[in-house]
């Protein structure tokens, strides 16, 4: 069994009295999810997440301390993938899309995220993010 490790984040911004999250639509599979990618070399989890968010969307982030949500799943036969997600506030809002992998990037209200996200794991992450943001 092969193991893979990726890191990413639920990226948010505050707009008036609302919170919006950043979602991406992948060209491969057409699913909506959060920015993430494989750990390279001796990168830390945060370094990987920061690099992947910037590469895929052009967004710089600041991580929320204390939020770390691991997810494990099997994307294909004989592969187990561990993904660590963080919660991060966007420092800029203009997209620069990684066109090789991403077809769309969008800000959506956090309360509408369940309608867009393809996978149940991501819907669970939104619940955790909402809970953490309420405590801030």
Model-identified regions with their sequence ranges:
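Short small-residue beta-strand/loop micro-motif enriched in glycine and branched aliphatics
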Residues: 31-34
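Anionic group-transfer/hydrolysis microenvironments
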Residues: 10, 27, 111
